[in-house]
Amino acid sequence: MTALLIDGNALSKTLRAQAAERAAALTARGHRPGLAVILVGDNPASEVYVRNKIKACEDNGFFSQKDTYPATLSEADLLARIDELNRDPKIHGILVQLPLPAHIDSHKVIEAIAPEKDVDGFHVANAGALMTGKPLFRPCTPYGVMKMFAAHGIALQGANAVVIGRSNIVGKPMAMLLLEAGATVTICHSKTRDLAAHTRQADIIVAAVGKRNILTADMVKPGATVIDVGMNRDDAGKLCGDVDFAGVKEVAGYITPVPGGVGPMTITMLLINTLESAERAAAAA
């Protein structure tokens, strides 16, 4: 069998069109959704990510502003800028692009963002709310994956799910959202003794470690759904994921490609989180 492709670009297009309609309705009431993105330093990958986020805002009727600072920016000055944005009624979402220069404590920076504007969902208050099943914001990448499952009618209740990776950005929140949906969840990581023993039992596999070919065809149960969150480069410099796509697609039931899978969904869910923040602010006004 050859797996059915879960097309992140196509789903993103649909969700962004819906978000643009809701944004237009809010704007008509004087509450245009606004996102502020802060970039410190000149990391080329970060510059691309920020550019894509700003463009997504512009294309869908959101207000956006980009604050760019040199790598020498002090932690105190960055925290002061975040405080200003916290108090700015035009801004409903604040995103600080990671990684930050070594002299800036990223944990302190994330905690400085007002929880109600933390559209990445990284603040400890939002992480805690996710743990209790009542999140204000769901982290964008796992949220996007959940939308993919829903769009393709992939059953999660009672399913065996394996998440490979335990980061605060993807692995842990992904496991929490799957658990919330009724799946039986196993988290695997670099210290897991026999990864294949876990993945071969899984109906759902989410690979999110940033290691090429960590999941191969012999590790996948026929018909399983495989979500590839990884972003790596192959020997030719071509973008690839964590999954051996060519092999696994012949075994899996559903699979996401890289590029064109989870990546577009991450920015789409950032828009939706910002939109939901703006809707809450408008309701409270």
UniProtKB/Swiss-Prot annotation:
InterPro entries reported in the protein's UniProt record: Aminoacid_DH-like_N_sf (IPR046346), NAD(P)-bd_dom_sf (IPR036291), THF_DH/CycHdrlase (IPR000672), THF_DH/CycHdrlase_cat_dom (IPR020630), THF_DH/CycHdrlase_CS (IPR020867), THF_DH/CycHdrlase_NAD-bd_dom (IPR020631)
Pathway: One-carbon metabolism; tetrahydrofolate interconversion
A GO BP entry: methionine biosynthetic process
Single GO term (MF): methylenetetrahydrofolate dehydrogenase (NADP+) activity
EC number, UniProt record: 1.5.1.5, 3.5.4.9
Amino-acid positions noted as binding NADP(+) in the UniProt annotation, renumbered to this chain: G165, R166, S167, S190
Catalytic activity entry: (6R)-5,10-methylene-5,6,7,8-tetrahydrofolate + NADP(+) = (6R)-5,10-methenyltetrahydrofolate + NADPH; (6R)-5,10-methenyltetrahydrofolate + H2O = (6R)-10-formyltetrahydrofolate + H(+)
Top-rank taxon: Bacteria
ATP-binding among keywords: no
Cross-referenced Pfam families: THF_DHG_CYH (PF00763), THF_DHG_CYH_C (PF02882)
GO cellular component labels: cytosol
Family matches, as CDD domains: NAD_bind_m-THF_DH_Cyclohyd
Alphabetical UniProt keywords: Amino-acid biosynthesis, Histidine biosynthesis, Hydrolase, Methionine biosynthesis, Multifunctional enzyme, NADP, One-carbon metabolism, Oxidoreductase, Purine biosynthesis
SUBUNIT field: Homodimer.
Family affiliation: Belongs to the tetrahydrofolate dehydrogenase/cyclohydrolase family.
Role description: Catalyzes the oxidation of 5,10-methylenetetrahydrofolate to 5,10-methenyltetrahydrofolate and then the hydrolysis of 5,10-methenyltetrahydrofolate to 10-formyltetrahydrofolate.
Protein name from the UniProt record: Bifunctional protein FolD
Gene name tied to this protein: folD
